[in-house]
Amino acid sequence: MLPLVALVGRPNVGKSTIFNALTRTRDALVHDQPGVTRDRNYGVCRLDEQQPFIVVDTGGIAGDEDGLAGATARQARAAAGEADLVLFVVDGREGESSLDDEILAWLRKLARPTVLVINKIDGTDEETVRSEFARYGFSDVVALSAAHRQGIDELLEEVGARLPEEGSGELLDNDPARVRIAFVGRPNVGKSTLVNRLLGEERMIASEVPGTTRDSIAVDLERDGRQYRLIDTAGLRRRGKVEEAVEKFSAFKTLQAIERCQVAVLMLDATEGVTDQDATILGAILDAGRALVVAINKWDGQSDYQRAQAEDLLSRKLGFVSWAEAVRISALHGSGMRELFQAIHRAHASATHEFSTSEVNQALEIAYETNPPPSIRGHVSKLRYVHPGGANPPTFIVHGTRLKVLPESYKRYLENFFRKRFKLVGTPVCFIFREGANPYEGKKNPLSDRQVARKRRLMRHVKGK
């Protein structure tokens, strides 16, 4: 296990900027606005290959124990409590504050090894800034400007000198057998509540306030002997309602999470049905070609009549993805969790199945003989052979002639035939049609000597007339 370093401080002192500098990533959202970070975000610092360590970015502690601010503070305290070293970050431009004093008092009670990090010293007198924070009594102080990457090397030296060889941090592995699941949907449909329920702890901040989750946070889970990576994402609103830059960044991170996952769980609110924005998010999942499971949350609070209405709306608005399984759950009370994971397993197995060329050609032959392509303006498409073209989604490349006139209805027939034959559920299926090149196209047959002589006689005869 690697040593764990926690970044702690009040809002907007630059913790996320330091996190990005140490991890050489842009994983943490950064904006000149307090309260951007809320959930714990873990990364690995490998700037010194001899001594890598885990860094955890935390939300700013604002001194309020209620609502989102209180939940954010609890997340920060949890991170500091499990850390081997705490980096207490303060703002060198604004100077010390009463909130810094409160955080320092709490850190002293925690009794974890702590380094004072004075950020944003660019444009200031460093000695003056250091003297202002001297009353905190730290022997280990690092002054830096994370935005300009000044002082990061000094910070690494200080951290390296204080870290144990073994620590309490667990590294997110790159095990290809680990199923990557992204929970996506509109704001306030219960994504964070569901992830917390699966983890058995308040790992994500869950609130009735829409837009609570700002970043895409990945955590590992072992359940029934299988390994998963759960990705909690920010809710996606309609583009016309997205005004703040932070929300635009959050939306980008959510779309990025969809691209990187293997199974996307689209969460719907049973009390609101299927909205146009739900369909837009579904479109993003289909564009990425990801396996899909639809989770209808808050199902337990609905009457029989409301459930019947929701089922009817679901079949009408999501009929075009009838291949995706829909699971009724309650993230708050934990009902439907087993059914949800069973659907995820089936979708993942279908999306990542490796097909042999012989079995897909046999399927194409049966489909072709059972229902040949129709004649279009006297032209009939011929399907010669097919081979696998990849997974997630399953892709089949069909070769033949006159495929440009192959009607869409026949392409849907092939998709449905392959789904039924190979029992593919919960995943899109992609067909690519390629026509074989005509080797004689653009070429003329060479004439024999006899044909040349005949052509000359014919031309003399025509001219003679």
From Swiss-Prot:
Disulfides per UniProt: none
Transmembrane segments: none
GO MF entries: ATP hydrolysis activity; GTP binding; ribosome binding
One GO biological process term: ribosome biogenesis
Domain spans labelled EngA-type G: 3-167, 179-352
Assembly and binders: Associates with the 50S ribosomal subunit.
Protein name: GTPase Der
Species, as recorded: Xanthomonas oryzae pv. oryzae (strain MAFF 311018)
